[in-house]
Amino acid sequence: MAEYKLELKGVCKSFPGVKALDNVQLSLRPGTVHALMGENGAGKSTFIKVITGVHKAEEGEMYLFGEKVDFKGPKDAQEAGIAAVYQHPTSYPHLTVAENIFMGHEKKKGFFLDDKAHSEGAKKILQRLEHEIPPETMVGDLRVGQQQMVEIARNLNQDDLRVLIMDEPTSSLSAAEVKVLFKIMRELLEAGISIVYICLLYTSPSPRDTERS
């Protein structure tokens, strides 16, 4: 078995006039959390998008369980078990909470979507997050913190989750929601899931919640 779950070696990515990533190295062991801290414009978002297949690196290599991977797009990364919670919710406001949570992981009953299974599954995940949001609620009607919890729930609904990247996930959460989030993070680590926790220098999580930075 490979020592590292995810590795980046010499990754570079540039945009016109800007070198966003310069020889980035990352070694992520199973069941560990790494804090990636930096100011705005330091390349944190580009880093996420390279790992999740949104951007393609110009140089360097990425390995998953010791095998080289070359994601052609976000779907490839998702199928490999890599998920991301972004700073600003990317949920669909015109869809319900349940529809958002099961987006890309829809359950079917015959030729039709199984709305009952979606509703029950959404309730179960939201209870784990200590949120009693009705699954039929439109996401656009929720406050920003609740939308972020729906985003987290959608990623937790990924059965083959291996690596979770969290981009300033607490920025729109209440103190109580942050406490729940850190509890969930510890549960994920115990299950062997690896986490990359991205934050600004002055909003870094407690040292006890991260193992490397």
What is the predicted function of each stretch?
Residues 2, 70-75, 107-128, 132-136, ...:
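Short coil-to-helix "N-cap" segments within the ABC nucleotide-binding domain's helical subdomain
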Residues 37-39:
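The feature captures the beta-strand-to-loop junction immediately N-terminal to the Walker
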Residues 52:
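Helix-to-loop junction immediately C-terminal to a conserved catalytic motif
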Residues 164-168:
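Catalytic Walker B motif of ABC-type/P-loop ATPase nucleotide-binding domains
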Residues 202, 207-213:
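Single conserved hydrophobic/aromatic residue that forms the stacking wall/gate
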